[in-house]
């Protein structure tokens, strides 16, 4: 880890020393292609050879839920594998597994739905992966029977996640995100909502926020860019653009002058933990990522700082001179 940090630092400083002077306040260049409301990113990378990864990235999630929808963004992640326009039932999983793409390994969903390490020699498999992204974008079936079956799956997931670490985090969350909607959402959601919501509530949430102007397609790997771009235009041009969509709200964690603190305990906790958390705020951050070159520099420097502190604490532990173990 130390070698990687030093290498990154050297490269970054070398660029500063040998390149033209950098205008740190300059806006970062936009680099998307936009097709009928869908943003897509294509990058050629020869390693690993003849392989690629396919992503659909959502700018939507739990923060957009109303109280009666608490947990539905996470629920939709599960439903992505329970039937769509071109892949009824569990056929999406079985189709990919025939090609060695495993569910949970190469096939996943969170804010980003992805299929990774796809062999590119088989042209039909490429077309299949694009069709899956197409269905994820707008065409999930959301069958009431499948929804009811998934309620139990998510209830069990909640039970297995209900550890001392989770309970301690839930005590800290109102302090960490005080005054923000982040304090109100824990992604997996409210079990009462999960058990009782109506299927149309899930469909309404899906079609309101999971739409083309709030998503992007990203494909990275060893393939011909022009050929892939043509395939994307052919597959995704049929997805309708939502007229007059509701603007996507963004949520900030309010600044505060005084230091907040929290003492969180749980009877099943097996160790004690002390954390110091700082919020670094980019001046022009708009909720969409880094805005300027200075933002990128700040992000790198914060990362270097955190890594250096971790390395030094680790060295103290190795020498047996610390009252802590990690």
What are these regions (language model features)?
Residues 47-95, 276, 287-309:
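Active/ligand-binding-proximal structured segments within catalytic/core domains
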Residues 21-33, 113, 123, 171-215, ...:
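Histidine-acidic residue clusters that define the catalytic metal-binding segment
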Residues 27-29, 35-37, 49-53, 57, ...:
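Extracytoplasmic
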Residues 62, 100-102, 277, 306-326:
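A structural supersecondary motif
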Residues 58-168, 181, 185, 193-196, ...:
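Active-site-adjacent, His/Asp/Glu-enriched structural segments that form or flank metal-binding
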Residues 10-18:
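Hydrophobic h-region of N-terminal signal peptides that target proteins for export
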Residues 21, 216-273:
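An aromatic/glycine/proline-enriched structural segment found at the starts
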Residues 46, 246-312:
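His/Glu-based metal-binding/catalytic segments typifying zinc-dependent metallopeptidases
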């Amino acid at each position: 880890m130390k070698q990687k940090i030093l290498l990154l630092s050297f490269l970054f400083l070398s660029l500063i020393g040998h390149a033209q002077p950098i205008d740190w306040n300059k806006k970062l260049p936009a680099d998307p292609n936009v097709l009928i409301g869908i943003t897509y990113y294509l990058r050629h990378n020869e390693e690993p050879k003849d392989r690629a990864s396919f992503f659909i990235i959502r700018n939507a999630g739990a923060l957009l839920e109303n109280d009666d929808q608490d947990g539905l963004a996470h629920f939709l992640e599960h439903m992505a594998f329970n039937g769509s326009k071109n892949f009824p039932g569990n056929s999406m999983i079985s189709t990919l597994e025939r090609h060695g793409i495993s569910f949970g390994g190469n096939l996943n969903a969170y804010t980003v739905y992805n299929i990774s390490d796809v062999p590119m020699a088989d042209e039909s498999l490429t077309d299949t992966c694009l069709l899956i992204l197409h269905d994820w974008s707008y065409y999930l079936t959301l069958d009431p029977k499948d929804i009811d079956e998934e309620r139990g799956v998510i209830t069990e997931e909640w039970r297995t996640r209900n550890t001392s670490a989770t309970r301690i985090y839930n005590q800290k969350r109102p302090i960490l995100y005080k005054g923000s909607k982040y304090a109100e959402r824990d992604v997996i959601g409210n079990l009462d909502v999960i058990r009782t919501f109506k299927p149309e509530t899930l469909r309404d949430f899906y079609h309101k926020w999971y739409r083309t102007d709030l998503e992007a397609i990203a494909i990275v790997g060893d393939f011909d860019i022009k050929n892939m771009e043509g395939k994307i235009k052919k597959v995704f041009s049929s997805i309708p653009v939502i007229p007059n969509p509701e603007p996507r709200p963004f949520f900030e964690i309010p600044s505060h002058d005084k230091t907040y603190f929290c003492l969180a305990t749980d009877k099943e906790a097996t160790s004690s933990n002390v954390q110091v958390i700082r919020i670094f705020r980019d001046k022009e951050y708009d909720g969409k990522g880094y805005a300027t070159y200075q933002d990128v520099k700040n992000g790198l420097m914060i990362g270097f700082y955190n890594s250096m502190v971790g390395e030094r604490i680790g060295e103290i532990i190795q020498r047996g001179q610390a009252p802590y173990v990690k």
